[in-house]
Regions:
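Amphipathic, well-ordered alpha-helical segments in soluble domains
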Residues: 14-21, 47-50, 81
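Amphipathic alpha-helical interaction modules
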Residues: 25-57
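Short, solvent-exposed segments of well-ordered alpha helices
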Residues: 1-13, 35-38, 65, 69-72, ...
Length: 94
Protein backbone atom coordinates (compact mmCIF):
# COMPACT_ATOMS: atom_id res chain seq x y z
CA UNK A 1 0.00 0.00 0.00
CA UNK A 2 2.84 2.38 0.75
CA UNK A 3 4.30 1.99 -2.72
CA UNK A 4 0.94 2.67 -4.31
CA UNK A 5 0.54 5.79 -2.18
CA UNK A 6 4.03 6.98 -3.16
CA UNK A 7 3.27 6.33 -6.83
CA UNK A 8 0.05 8.36 -6.64
CA UNK A 9 1.87 11.17 -4.85
CA UNK A 10 4.59 11.17 -7.53
CA UNK A 11 1.95 11.32 -10.26
CA UNK A 12 0.36 14.31 -8.55
CA UNK A 13 3.69 16.10 -8.14
CA UNK A 14 4.68 15.61 -11.76
CA UNK A 15 1.25 16.68 -12.99
CA UNK A 16 1.44 19.78 -10.81
CA UNK A 17 4.86 20.67 -12.18
CA UNK A 18 3.73 20.21 -15.78
CA UNK A 19 0.57 22.23 -15.17
CA UNK A 20 2.59 25.04 -13.55
CA UNK A 21 5.01 25.09 -16.47
CA UNK A 22 2.17 25.33 -19.00
CA UNK A 23 0.48 28.05 -16.96
CA UNK A 24 3.75 29.99 -16.74
CA UNK A 25 4.15 29.78 -20.53
CA UNK A 26 0.60 31.00 -21.03
CA UNK A 27 0.81 33.94 -18.64
CA UNK A 28 4.37 35.20 -18.87
CA UNK A 29 5.82 34.33 -22.26
CA UNK A 30 4.88 36.65 -25.11
CA UNK A 31 3.57 35.10 -28.29
CA UNK A 32 2.21 31.91 -26.73
CA UNK A 33 -1.13 30.76 -28.09
CA UNK A 34 -3.47 30.70 -25.06
CA UNK A 35 -5.78 28.12 -26.59
CA UNK A 36 -2.93 25.66 -27.15
CA UNK A 37 -1.75 26.23 -23.58
CA UNK A 38 -5.28 25.52 -22.34
CA UNK A 39 -5.33 22.26 -24.31
CA UNK A 40 -2.00 21.22 -22.79
CA UNK A 41 -3.20 22.06 -19.28
CA UNK A 42 -6.37 20.02 -19.83
CA UNK A 43 -4.24 17.13 -21.08
CA UNK A 44 -2.13 17.30 -17.91
CA UNK A 45 -5.23 17.11 -15.72
CA UNK A 46 -6.63 14.22 -17.74
CA UNK A 47 -3.29 12.42 -17.49
CA UNK A 48 -3.27 12.85 -13.72
CA UNK A 49 -6.80 11.46 -13.35
CA UNK A 50 -6.13 8.53 -15.67
CA UNK A 51 -2.90 7.39 -14.03
CA UNK A 52 -4.15 7.75 -10.46
CA UNK A 53 -7.21 5.72 -11.45
CA UNK A 54 -4.96 3.08 -13.02
CA UNK A 55 -2.74 3.00 -9.91
CA UNK A 56 -5.77 2.28 -7.74
CA UNK A 57 -6.92 -0.82 -9.63
CA UNK A 58 -4.20 -3.28 -10.68
CA UNK A 59 -5.07 -6.34 -12.74
CA UNK A 60 -5.00 -9.73 -11.03
CA UNK A 61 -4.53 -8.73 -7.41
CA UNK A 62 -3.96 -12.32 -6.33
CA UNK A 63 -1.07 -12.90 -8.77
CA UNK A 64 1.98 -10.92 -7.63
CA UNK A 65 3.78 -11.34 -10.96
CA UNK A 66 0.88 -9.82 -12.90
CA UNK A 67 0.64 -6.94 -10.42
CA UNK A 68 4.36 -6.23 -10.78
CA UNK A 69 4.09 -6.29 -14.59
CA UNK A 70 1.05 -4.02 -14.38
CA UNK A 71 2.89 -1.39 -12.34
CA UNK A 72 6.00 -1.61 -14.55
CA UNK A 73 3.80 -0.95 -17.59
CA UNK A 74 2.03 1.85 -15.71
CA UNK A 75 5.35 3.56 -14.94
CA UNK A 76 6.53 3.18 -18.55
CA UNK A 77 3.26 4.62 -19.88
CA UNK A 78 3.50 7.47 -17.38
CA UNK A 79 7.02 8.34 -18.49
CA UNK A 80 5.97 8.28 -22.15
CA UNK A 81 3.04 10.60 -21.44
CA UNK A 82 5.21 12.96 -19.36
CA UNK A 83 7.74 13.21 -22.18
CA UNK A 84 5.00 13.91 -24.74
CA UNK A 85 3.46 16.66 -22.61
CA UNK A 86 6.88 18.18 -21.87
CA UNK A 87 7.56 18.32 -25.61
CA UNK A 88 4.24 20.08 -26.18
CA UNK A 89 5.07 22.61 -23.47
CA UNK A 90 8.45 23.20 -25.08
CA UNK A 91 6.77 23.86 -28.41
CA UNK A 92 4.45 26.43 -26.83
CA UNK A 93 7.31 28.84 -26.30
CA UNK A 94 8.63 28.62 -29.87
Amino acid sequence: MDKRRILKRDISYVAGDLFSEALFCKLYLPGVNSEKADVVMARVLDMQDEFIRRANRPDGKENKKRVKEYYCKLRADLQTEINAIATEIGELSK
